[in-house]
């Protein structure tokens, strides 16, 4: 399953949550699939969608989902430590790992080798870190969103 198919699959789960989508192609794809007023497309700063989403979740009570790529997370790994230590219950970070910097020419990231973002997130103190692929992603996102609505 590619990123476009995954973003399309997630549309039934994402309802009124605020969504911050990362730079470039993912934002363009999400816009093409289903532009909504609760979507913010971070087009200008690689690595900052997770930081912006975290800031929103700290400022308001509404559920916030940041959709970030492995390349962007690798560009700003210190955000994982901040999320691990300060993220409120209304924040979800979804990392789409396609093992490449997709918006800059598909150069391979180190997740293609020995770097595990799951292990990095756990080491940074993030709770409830789930690694999944394909169709499992929507089910896991549904659970995460449902937990935040209780």
Give the predicted meaning of each segment.
Residues 3-6, 13, 32-150:
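Thiamine diphosphate
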Residues 10, 19-21, 83:
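Generic structural hydrophobic/aromatic packing signal, biased to beta-strands
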Residues 17-35:
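Acidic-glycine-rich active-site phosphate/pyrophosphate-binding loop
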């Amino acid at each position: 399953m590619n990123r476009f198919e995954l973003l399309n699959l997630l549309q039934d789960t994402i309802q009124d949550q605020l969504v911050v989508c990362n730079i470039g192609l993912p934002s363009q794809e999400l816009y093409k699939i289903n532009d909504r007023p609760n979507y913010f497309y971070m087009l200008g700063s690689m690595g900052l969608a997770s930081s912006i989403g975290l800031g929103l979740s700290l400022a308001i009570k509404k559920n916030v989902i940041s959709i970030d790529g492995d390349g962007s997370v690798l560009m700003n790994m210190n955000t994982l430590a901040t999320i691990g230590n300060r993220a409120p219950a209304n924040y979800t970070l979804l990392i789409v790992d396609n093992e490449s910097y997709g918006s800059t020419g598909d150069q391979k990231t180190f997740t293609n080798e020995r770097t595990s973002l799951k292990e990095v997130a756990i080491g940074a103190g993030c709770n409830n870190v789930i690694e999944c692929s394909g169709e499992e992603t929507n089910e896991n996102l549904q659970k995460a969103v449902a937990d935040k609505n209780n």
